[in-house]
A protein has these predicted regions:
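Phosphate- and other anionic-substrate recognition elements at nucleic-acid/protein interfaces
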Residues: 1-61
Length: 61
């Protein structure tokens, strides 16, 4: 199981991923709101099976 936290921003977002034992799989990494940004995100997350996402959307968007 992998756990990913995404901080949603107006122009770019940040993602960090940890494993079940708390091991850091991806330190805070930015990704954009375009196709290449989401391709980058999917590369960082790996396969969708076994990945739990949490979003922090504190802005008005």
């Amino acid at each position: 199981m992998r756990f990913a936290g995404i901080d949603v921003g107006a122009e770019r977002h940040m993602v960090a991923v940890v494993g079940e034992q708390g091991e850091v799989l991806c330190r805070s990494s930015p990704f954009g709101e375009d196709a290449s940004g989401y391709v980058h995100l999917f590369e960082l997350l790996g396969p969708p099976e076994g990945c739990l996402l949490a979003l922090e959307a504190t802005g008005h968007y």
